[in-house]
């Protein structure tokens, strides 16, 4: 069954947990799609895990369109959500609609995601009015890392917690069909999930959310620069890849690879005519 913004909301009504992972290329998207994951986020996290930047701020619209287009070719039943990169929507309502439209039209995404609470509700409303579904994102919003002073848990004191509750209700009212809660205390995220009717997708927000999302390189043990506390590693592919690469080097140097079975034959008759 094809996952859509509508089926996400229906899953919450049925109390069925939603699953999401990031992807940035065709091959990974195809594997994730075949596994039955509900949603793929083409995240601006690609700036860190794919392009080697220290944060997400350097990612451009062209980067997002390029990677989103690749992902949508591999995702047949999985909902594809494209991140709106830094400064693609903060500048004006007009810019937010235009750039959201580019991610849908050129990137072929089904949904766009933007970070922020009450301060971006005018953008959410305008994008939704343009018939583009929006996934909101509150709590730790990586594009605001400089304002936060680093990657820190949000909503730990009374006022900050109340502000997150207000933000969740505001983005719902603005028309978002779902909201990501990032690095929010578990009990607060559970409370927010009960307070709003749209699905909450948690990342570092505990099991009380309506769904979960992880960066796939994190959960597969492929990104060694930094592993957040909230990540569970389901594999250690970095180690396995290193072993495979080392073995490849050894076999090439020792003349073991390629073997006869990896080559193509030519008849002796043809070969003799070459001399």
From Swiss-Prot:
Catalyzed reaction equations: 3-methyl-2-oxobutanoate + (6R)-5,10-methylene-5,6,7,8-tetrahydrofolate + H2O = 2-dehydropantoate + (6S)-5,6,7,8-tetrahydrofolate
Compartment(s): Cytoplasm
Active site: 182
Keyword Magnesium (UniProt): yes
Assigned GO CC terms: cytoplasm
Pfam families: Pantoate_transf
Residue positions binding 3-methyl-2-oxobutanoate: 44-45, 83, 113
Top-level taxon of the source organism: Bacteria
Residues annotated as binding Mg(2+): 44, 83, 115
Entry note: cofactor: Binds 1 Mg(2+) ion per subunit.
MF terms (GO), sorted A to Z: 3-methyl-2-oxobutanoate hydroxymethyltransferase activity; magnesium ion binding
Uppermost EC category: transferase
Keywords associated with the record: Cytoplasm, Magnesium, Metal-binding, Pantothenate biosynthesis, Transferase
EC number, as in UniProt: 2.1.2.11
Cofactor: Mg(2+)
Pathway of action: Cofactor biosynthesis; (R)-pantothenate biosynthesis; (R)-pantoate from 3-methyl-2-oxobutanoate: step 1/2
Family matches, as SUPFAM superfamilies: Phosphoenolpyruvate/pyruvate domain
GO biological process, one term: pantothenate biosynthetic process
HAMAP family linked to this entry: PanB
Assembly, per entry: Homodecamer; pentamer of dimers.
Protein purpose: Catalyzes the reversible reaction in which hydroxymethyl group from 5,10-methylenetetrahydrofolate is transferred onto alpha-ketoisovalerate to form ketopantoate.
Homology family: Belongs to the PanB family.
Protein name (database record): 3-methyl-2-oxobutanoate hydroxymethyltransferase
Species per Swiss-Prot/TrEMBL record: Enterococcus faecalis (strain ATCC 700802 / V583)
């Amino acid at each position: 069954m094809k996952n859509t913004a509508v089926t996400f909301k229906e899953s919450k009504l049925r109390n069925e947990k939603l699953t999401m992972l990031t992807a940035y290329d065709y091959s990974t998207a195809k594997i994730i799609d075949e596994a039955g994951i509900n949603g793929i986020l083409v995240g601006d996290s690609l700036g860190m895990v794919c392009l080697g930047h220290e944060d997400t701020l350097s990612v451009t619209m062209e980067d997002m369109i390029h990677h989103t287009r690749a992902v949508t070719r591999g995702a047949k039943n999985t909902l594809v959500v494209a991140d709106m990169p830094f400064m693609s929507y903060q500048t004006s309502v007009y810019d937010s609609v235009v750039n959201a439209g580019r991610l849908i039209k050129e990137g072929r995404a089904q949904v766009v995601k933007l970070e922020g609470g009450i301060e971006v509700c005018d953008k959410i409303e305008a994008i939704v009015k343009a018939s583009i579904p929006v996934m909101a994102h509150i709590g730790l919003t990586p594009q605001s890392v400089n304002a936060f002073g680093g990657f820190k848990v949000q909503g730990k004191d009374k006022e900050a917690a109340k502000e997150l509750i207000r933000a969740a209700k505001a983005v719902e009212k603005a028309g978002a069909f779902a909201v990501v809660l990032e690095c929010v205390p578990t009990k607060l995220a559970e409370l927010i999930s009960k307070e709003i009717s749209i699905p909450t997708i948690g990342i570092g927000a505990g099991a009380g959310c309506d769904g979960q999302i992880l960066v796939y390189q994190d959960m597969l043990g492929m990104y060694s620069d930094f592993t957040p506390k909230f990540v569970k590693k389901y594999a250690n592919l970095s180690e396995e890849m290193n072993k495979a690469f080392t073995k490849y080097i050894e076999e090439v140097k020792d003349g073991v690879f390629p073997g006869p079975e990896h080559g193509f034959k030519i008849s002796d008759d043809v070969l003799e005519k070459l001399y």
